[in-house]
UniProtKB/Swiss-Prot annotation:
Lineage summary: Bacteria, Bacillati, Actinomycetota, Actinomycetes, Mycobacteriales
Induction record: Constitutively expressed.
GO biological process assignments: modification-dependent protein catabolic process; proteasomal protein catabolic process
Family of the protein in this entry: Belongs to the AAA ATPase family.
Family matches, as InterPro entries: AAA+_ATPase, AAA_ATPase_domain, ATPase_AAA_core, ATPase_AAA_CS, NA-bd_OB-fold, P-loop_NTPase, Prot_ATP_ID_OB_2nd, Prot_ATP_ID_OB_N
Pathway: Protein degradation; proteasomal Pup-dependent pathway
HAMAP family (UniProt xref): ARC_ATPase
Keyword check for Metal-binding: no
Record field: transmembrane: none
Keyword set, alphabetical order: ATP-binding, Chaperone, Coiled coil, Nucleotide-binding, Proteasome
Species this chain originates from: Rhodococcus erythropolis (Arthrobacter picolinophilus)
NCBIfam families the UniProt entry points to: pup_AAA
Protein name: Proteasome-associated ATPase
Amino acid sequence: MSSTENPDSVAAAEELHALRVEAQVLRRQLAQSPEQVRELESKVDSLSIRNSKLMDTLKEARQQLIALREEVDRLGQPPSGYGVLLSVHEDKTVDVFTSGRKMRLTCSPNIDTDTLALGQTVRLNEALTIVEAGTYEQVGEISTLREVLDDGLRALVVGHADEERIVWLAAPLAAVFADPEADIIAYDADSPTRKLRPGDSLLVDTKAGYAFERIPKAEVEDLVLEEVPDVHYDDIGGLGRQIEQIRDAVELPFLHKDLFHEYSLRPPKGVLLYGPPGCGKTLIAKAVANSLAKKIAEARGQDSKDAKSYFLNIKGPELLNKFVGETERHIRMIFQRAREKASEGTPVIVFFDEMDSIFRTRGSGVSSDVETTVVPQLLSEIDGVEGLENVIVIGASNREDMIDPAILRPGRLDVKIKIERPDAESAQDIFSKYLVDGLPINADDLAEFGGDRTACLKAMIVRVVDRMYAESEENRFLEVTYANGDKEVLFFKDFNSGAMIQNIVDRAKKYAIKSVLDTGAPGLRVQHLFDSIVDEFAENEDLPNTTNPDDWARISGKKGERIVYIRTLVTGKNASASRAIDTESNTGQYL
């Protein structure tokens, strides 16, 4: 420092320098402040996110802790018991059957005793207090209902080894007796319950003494079809006389009861339709049920669309059961159901198909004597103490000679109608049911009749029937030898049936379809029908039973002198002569 410089100025200069340095530092710090602020803000955001995650983790841990505590409490609870509710008292106490004892218990405050139903399952805590109401038992023993007692709350049932006991009816079963006049009472809106009837199978808890549910019996339900068949008399061809006979026997008594009463005429109890297979026996029975329902609906002033009748179609062979008494029980249940339906004033037809398989002549069985008890059961149902008002029995068989004579006597199956094989006129009528105007016809065949479809179809039917019923060499079928030595040649027309005619038409339609695919020429031709006849006859060449020719002939509808020998005579085929075997009696079951 020079001597000339003022000390004050020097100090001021140093201070100014220091201020400049400080200002520079402040400028640098000011420039760095926004970055620090941003860093701090990002740190704050990161810490907030971590804090939220920690809070969520803490909540989840707290919830898991609560759930584990509840699980520990649940596992530590004493076991609950179950019982069947027997009765509810005015003081809110209830009687419960539990652990083999009948006990009077109290209910938890959250249980409304007014909603409890008899027979319901309830849950009990360790103090034997009802804490929860359940459903109904779904397992137990099967018992057969004998009868419902007058109070409608109890029933007599038969259990294992024919042990009888009185049981209470659970609420779903007891509810159907609230209105004695009603046949259907909806205990639950989603599942209407029908009235119980003797023979029903019930699910029973024998210890608690309650019946909970009606169990359908598949072995009986499968045997019976309750329906109105959609078959009309117009659908049946060639059986006009037989249809008139069965209408007189079945429809007149139902439609004109006053006239029958005035003339003291008892309506027939049953009808037997017999004849060769495939000739329309079952079809007639179905048409009777349909026609009867419509006629009665018209007589009552109802719409024919609302016509109602019951056609109980009994599958004969399936009715048989290897256990003693089961077949008879099924027959009793079938007629019990028929009486129930008929009590409403609705006609009921009980149709036994293949009647000879069930009600065979007593004493004719070789390996079984089941017919000795089954036949009397049917007889007692038809003309026993309990009447069959509005019920008629129709039987069908192609071996009427094997049915027990007691069933066929007047007063049981009064009317016997033979369904014969169709003659030429009947065959034309049957063909007309299948060859209808709506079928496509080949243009060449139509051209022969000037495009008249009706005339063309009629001519086709006439030509086909003439071909089938001609006693020509190509139509020879069998040569039969009788026991007295006489011989007779039988033609295919002697074994024709409605089922065979339907099969011929179906074959012809198939040929017409194949013709369209092969040649592109649409329409049915008479040649298709001729080819179908040849094929149908050829298929039947080996069908005759030459081991027991007489039994086969009886089933086929050929009765008379006993046949001991059969030889096929089909043209163009190698007919093999069968050796003659004398037929033994009662061999029908081996056919």
